[in-house]
């Protein structure tokens, strides 16, 4: 068994693909740098992430894949699932070797796997856009927090920056303990020192942190939500399918 160890970054994965072709040795397993090696292995290659190699591989993939298929690579990577790295490696190798495009060849298990995984991430991104609820803080920053299944926040920045260009905001991922802050000029990545703070657990800011009118707006939104609800048309099963229960604690109207 041939093992490649890399730094668990997307750039490291692209470098691993470059190294495999250069060495004419392809890994049976990709591991993070500190992961224990399997008992039965024949060769271990330490991948050193290299910007030049990464750029060359990405340019090659850009020539052989459509923009949509190229984006699916990023979506798959952001799934952070255990199988994503090896799945992407096999897929990119097939793309490199194929004389024509393979992105529509869903009979291939790796092509199908990349499509299905990227779709799951895309669906989760859309849920974040749909269900993000902002709370206005006392310092006039709009704060939104969620706990998405996948690491989709990097895929939402453009939307929030465009949609709320005239308002400072923070979106925070409670699962991965990081977020983004927009100061009306730039978007920067942030973290909170106390990852166990109460508002990170239940998704609601304490009253003393809120703008003086925030509670009034929240009550108004709840009243509107309940007033437009037609009791005779309630369908709890469909409601939970369209609005998964795992998001409810972050929704003002479900408080």
What is the meaning of each model-derived region?
Residues 101-195:
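Internal, well-folded beta-alpha domain core
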Residues 45-53, 186-200:
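Acidic, Ser/Thr-rich peripheral helices and adjacent loops at domain boundaries
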Residues 12-23, 89-94, 158-162, 219-226:
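Short, hydrophobic/amphipathic alpha-helical patches that form generic packing surfaces
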Residues 3-11, 43, 47, 104-107, ...:
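Short, charged/polar micro-motifs that form catalytic or ligand-binding hotspots
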Residues 31-129:
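Charged, alpha-helical interface segments at or near domain boundaries
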Residues 168, 180, 196, 200-255:
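Long, compositionally biased intrinsically disordered terminal regions
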Residues 71-76, 105, 174, 233-240:
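Short coil/turn segments at secondary-structure boundaries
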Residues 1-51:
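N-terminal ordered "arm"
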């Amino acid at each position: 068994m041939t093992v490649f160890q890399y730094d668990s970054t997307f750039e490291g994965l692209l470098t691993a693909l470059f190294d495999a072709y250069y060495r004419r040795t392809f890994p049976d397993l990709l591991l993070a740098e500190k992961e224990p090696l399997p008992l039965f292995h024949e060769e271990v290659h330490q991948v050193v992430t290299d910007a030049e190699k990464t750029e060359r591989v990405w340019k090659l993939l850009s020539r052989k894949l459509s923009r949509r298929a190229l984006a699916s690579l990023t979506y798959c990577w952001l799934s952070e699932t255990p199988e994503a790295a090896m799945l992407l490696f096999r897929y990119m190798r097939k793309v490199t070797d194929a004389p024509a495009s393979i992105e529509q060849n869903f009979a291939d298990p790796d092509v199908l796997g990349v499509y299905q995984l990227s779709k799951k991430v895309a669906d989760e991104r859309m849920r974040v856009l749909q269900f993000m609820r902002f709370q206005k803080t006392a310092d006039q920053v709009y704060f939104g927090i969620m706990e998405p299944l996948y690491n989709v926040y990097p895929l939402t920045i453009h939307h929030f920056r465009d949609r709320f260009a005239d308002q400072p905001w923070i979106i925070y991922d409670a699962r991965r303990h990081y977020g983004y802050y927009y100061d009306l000029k730039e978007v920067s990545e942030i973290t909170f020192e106390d990852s166990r703070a109460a508002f990170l657990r239940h998704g609601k800011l304490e009253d003393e942190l809120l703008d003086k009118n925030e509670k009034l707006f929240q009550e108004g939104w709840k009243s509107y939500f309940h007033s437009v609800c037609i009791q005779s048309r309630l369908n709890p099963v469909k409601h939970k399918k369209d609005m998964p229960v795992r998001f409810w604690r972050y929704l003002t109207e479900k408080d």
